[in-house]
Amino acid sequence: MKARYKAVVDRYAQAIRSGQLPAGSRLPTHRTLAAGERISLATATRVYRELEEMGLVSGETGRGTFVRDLSLPPGHGVDQQVVAADVVDLNFNYPSLPEQGDALREALRQLAMAGDIDSHLRYQPHAGRLAERDIIARHLTCQHFAPDAENVLIVNGAQHGLAMTVMGLLRPGDVVAVDALTYSGFKVLAALYHLELAAIPCRPEGPDLRALQTLCQQRRVRAVYTMPTLHNPLGWVLNTGQRQALADLARQHDLLIIEDAAYARLVSRPPPPVVSYAPERTVYVTGFSKNIATGLRVGVVISPPRYRPEIERAIRATTWNTPTLISSLICAWIEDGTVARFETQKRQDARQRQQVAREVLCGLPVVSHPDSYFVWLPLGEESRADRLANALMERRISVSTAEPFCVSATIPQALRIALGSVPFDSLRPALLSVRDAVEYEQYR
């Protein structure tokens, strides 16, 4: 005989899938469900937990349990979806410049004529060729930060760099402190490697470091993952005081710092990176996707010497080495000034797109940074982000909800709007459609 709670789960699942309970419907409270179904409160909680695991509902602390929009995949915004040609992509950031294709053609011609072309057919050192690591180290040198080429490891993009850091230095069950809203790609890594993410509350200016201090006093935290320069999705840039405080706290509690600098090169005059305040315990990860091109999968891990062998071993276990065809191309662009030129142009492009976003979304509670390629848009108290995302998809506009970025129990009703993928002339009309949809959702 089927367990009582299973029958309740099946009945609700059928009602949701058939549309009898439409997206956005608020379900009864746990106590009301328990009383109505004549089950215990613990069983009612189990019913909702199973429905949530099935991707049918989402529970939000303080608000209740709601039916998810089944036309959107769970975690909308995490998994790269195939976007139809007629869809305006405000979900992912693929910032590119018109002249980059011609520059790539010329770079490939130059590479083909280089004298060491045969070397690209052979295995290379796991961390990359030392000459290229030296070029990258000099490129990343800035105020208070001059990495040694020996500590630079070339990887297949910043995401691969994060994966190698996690794989090499952390173990299943380790507690990693992260912002309550954080980069969705790190959440995916944490799930794959069975890490426990502990959410640090977010303030407008950055993470609540007092809350991190309290967490470290109460639990054995192994590491902290941080995006101090152009945080994704909130766009903040931590000031020097916050960076020093984070470094001090990490020393006090012997934390590994994983500094994600994927967007850092887009900021004109950023503060010194966190690694400059705690070089002995910080792994610095960056790449060339956001400042150059997402398809050129070259990333960089800068590691303290004591951690380097473990990260290098992880590279060996996964990709052996980064293809030198691509790393050579990037290094040639660094040396001839192409990277610097593209970075300057990308900063200008991001600022122009932010200006358009500020103009179109004026009056809405937008959270962002002038150098960022995305904005965070909190919604009204009664608004439903999944319903709004679906309404926009019906208009052929793709956006991300807050769910992929959220680590805490309470999922905010908000949208992350990426500005970098659409042609500049298409951005304003797309954002006008977003504004119209948001206003309709608020006053429906």
Where are these regions (language model features)?
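Hydrophobic residues in well-ordered beta-strands that form the structural core
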Residues: 178, 199, 257-259, 330, ...
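Short beta-strand "wing" residues that participate in macromolecule-binding interfaces
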Residues: 58-60, 147, 399-400
